[in-house]
C-alpha cells in the first residue's frame, strides 16, 4: 500500500521545538496551501490549512531554519488521529507526518 503526500505552502506561524518525556524532538505547525482554482462566488483562490508534525532531526531542522511565511515543501504521509475533546465527544483529525522538508523559496524571497 502507498501513503505518500507532498505539499507546498507557507508556514502560518513560527514552529516551536518541544521534547517528549524521553527527549525526542517534535514540532507541529500548519502550512497554507492555495488551491489551483478560483471560487465562483468570490473569484478568489481558496486556501487549505494543513497540519504537519515533524519528529527528531526533521523537527530540529524546521525549528532552526523556518519561520512564519516561509515557503516549504513537505514530503510525508497522511495520518488520521482519533481523539476526544474536552466534552468527551469523539473527534478525528488529519495531519501530515513529515519525512522531509525543503525550502520552497530562496531565503531572500521568504523574508
Segments and roles (model prediction):
Residues 1-111:
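Single-stranded nucleic acid-binding surfaces, predominantly the OB-fold ssDNA-binding core
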Amino acid at each position: 500500500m502507498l501513503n505518500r503526500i507532498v505539499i507546498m505552502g507557507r508556514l502560518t506561524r513560527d514552529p516551536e521545538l518541544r521534547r517528549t518525556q524521553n527527549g525526542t524532538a517534535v514540532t507541529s505547525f500548519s502550512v497554507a496551501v492555495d488551491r489551483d482554482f478560483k471560487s465562483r462566488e468570490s473569484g478568489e483562490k481558496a486556501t487549505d490549512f494543513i497540519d504537519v508534525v515533524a519528529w527528531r532531526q526533521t523537527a530540529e531542522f524546521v525549528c532552526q531554519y523556518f519561520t512564519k511565511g516561509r515557503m516549504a515543501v513537505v514530503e510525508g504521509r497522511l495520518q488520521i488521529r482519533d481523539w476526544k475533546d474536552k466534552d468527551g465527544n469523539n473527534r478525528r483529525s488529519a495531519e501530515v507526518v513529515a519525512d522531509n522538508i525543503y525550502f520552497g523559496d530562496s531565503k531572500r524571497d521568504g523574508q
